[in-house]
A protein has these predicted regions:
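Short, basic phosphate-binding NTP loop
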Residues: 2-102, 111-122, 144, 397, ...
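Acidic, Mg2+-coordinating active-site environments of NTP-dependent enzymes
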Residues: 4, 60-66, 178-324, 349-350, ...
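Non-catalytic positions within long, well-ordered alpha-helices that form the structural scaffold/packing
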Residues: 43, 47-48, 169-170, 345, ...
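Phosphate-binding loop of NTP-binding sites
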Residues: 79-218, 222-233, 419, 443-444
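ATP-dependent carboxylate/acyl-activation modules
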Residues: 103, 109, 312-314, 434-442
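Active-site beta-alpha connecting loops in nucleotide-dependent enzymes
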Residues: 34-37, 310-313, 329-402
Length: 444
């Protein structure tokens, strides 16, 4: 593969897409292949729609068409990743290589990334991962979004399998790293909690090998132990307890996360957010720590965090005509589910309900982890519990919380809620992405 030719095409285009339907004119189109699609079949359509060039597999039939706008490569995904790495290595700010902050973790990745971006944007032109484009395709696309005006980049990396982070750090080559936390998620791919730590720890491994720095939550014993195992890391500590900060209690007048952050030994600054759930305090602390390191004042960092409004059903709090909803329906695993329930337990409300969907990709631990959540629900004595999915159905044979209603799908639960309206409750809505728990929100 001629990386120089490919990079010249990219510089000429400036924009990259893998979706032929998203062509607006002038893009570099990559014909990726998946289980149910082959982008090579859409390469000519992409060119007709206005793409300037299309990168295709050299063995695909379209490669023989002779169109000079086609760039044939052995593997289009590998070419996309190689192009991103080359772009990262050849992007400079004031004569120095662009600084990249790499971010991963079991929970809170996207929220933390958004908060970091918000804080750093006070002082810098920041390019960061859009949404949760954090996989083998999303990370190179994020890196290729870096432009001549970028002063700092924040790249989110997700992982479902042991070698995912190891591959992704080679694409974005971070100078700084931050692991939000490590917990029980994607156990089907990682095999165990130790497997999760080993996989996420590849970010620390890369930075240790390359003289990089990490932002370390000094309150998190797992992360502290992981960092201690790796020599050569420059550690920048932060943490709620480490700083002597406080998470203030929520109430009806202050339903969102509030914190008191020490400006000095004598003075605390109050921070009020639009984030639901005390578990977000560590995400906020991470963003403040990154901002402080890069010269953003504490006052400006607090102001930036206070202005951040979550979206896409991530730690959102919504007051409807009938209920108060804690919407955290984007994803779920045992660690984040337990944290969300702890937060619900801390809320002062006359009536409380939990509407939970299955936690997926837990492998042989699935039933036991769902049983653990049911036991937690029993201890909370909620006014209403609604459960969705086959994994919860299996767990219900071992533990059956009082006032629990089970549905096979979120659509089934939505229909039940329509027939049995819920009013006056504070309701937690959470589940794995595939369960689509957001479909019940209109009935609440």
């Amino acid at each position: 593969m001629d990386i120089q030719r490919l990079y010249a095409a990219f510089k000429e285009c400036g924009r990259v897409t893998t979706d032929s339907r998203a062509i607006s004119g002038g893009e570099l189109f990559f014909a990726l292949k998946g289980e149910n699609f082959d982008g090579n079949e859409y390469a000519l359509k992409a060119l007709d729609a206005g793409a300037r060039y299309a990168v295709v597999d050299e063995k695909a039939g379209v490669a023989a068409s002779g169109d000079p706008r086609l760039i044939a490569v052995p593997d289009t995904l590998a070419a996309l990743q190689a192009l991103a790495r080359h772009h990262r290595e050849n992007t400079f700010v004031n004569g120095r290589r662009l600084t990249v902050i790499g971010l991963t973790g079991t929970n809170g990745k996207t929220t933390t990334k958004e908060l970091i971006t918000k804080v750093l944007s006070v002082k810098y032109n920041v390019t960061s991962t859009q949404g949760n484009l954090n996989n083998d395709i999303g990370v190179p696309l994020s890196v290729l979004g870096i432009n001549s005006g970028t002063q700092l980049a924040v790249i989110e990396m997700g992982a479902n399998h042991p070698d995912d982070i190891e591959r992704l750090v080679k694409v974005c080559e971070p100078d700084y790293g931050l692991i939000t936390n490590v917990g029980k998620a994607h156990l089907l791919g990682f095999g165990s909690f130790e497997g999760v730590k080993k996989a996420k720890g590849k970010l620390y491994d890369y930075l240790a090998e390359h003289g990089g720095s990490i932002f370390l939550n000094a309150d998190d014993r797992d992360l502290v132990a992981m960092a201690a195992e790796r020599k050569g890391l420059n550690v920048i500590d932060y943490g709620i307890e480490y700083w002597g900060a406080m998470v203030l209690p929520s109430d009806a007048a202050h339903p969102f996360v509030r914190m008191a952050v020490p400006e000095s030994a004598e003075n605390l600054l109050c921070l009020e957010t639009h984030l639901a759930g005390a578990y977000n305090a560590t995400n906020i602390a991470a963003a403040i720590a990154v901002g402080l390191h890069f010269g953003v004042s504490l006052e400006d960092a607090i102001q930036a965090v206070s202005e951040y409004i979550p979206k896409n059903n991530r730690s959102q709090l919504e007051k409807t005509a009938r209920n108060i909803l804690i919407e955290d329906a984007y994803n779920a695993n045992p660690t984040s589910m337990a944290a969300a329930l702890d937060n619900l337990a801390s809320v002062h409300a006359p009536l409380k309900a939990a509407m939970l969907g299955d936690m997926r990709e837990l492998g042989e631990d699935s039933v036991s982890e769902h049983v653990a959540i049911l036991k937690k629900l029993v201890s909370m004595d909620l006014d209403l519990v609604c459960l969705v999915g086959e994994e919860f159905r299996k767990a219900l044979s071992q533990v059956d919380p009082a006032a629990a209603h089970w549905s096979g799908t979120s659509d089934d639960l939505a229909a039940w809620l329509k027939a049995n309206p819920v009013s006056g409750h504070t309701v937690l809505v959470k589940g794995s992405r595939g369960i689509r728990m957001e479909r019940i929100l209109s009935e609440l």
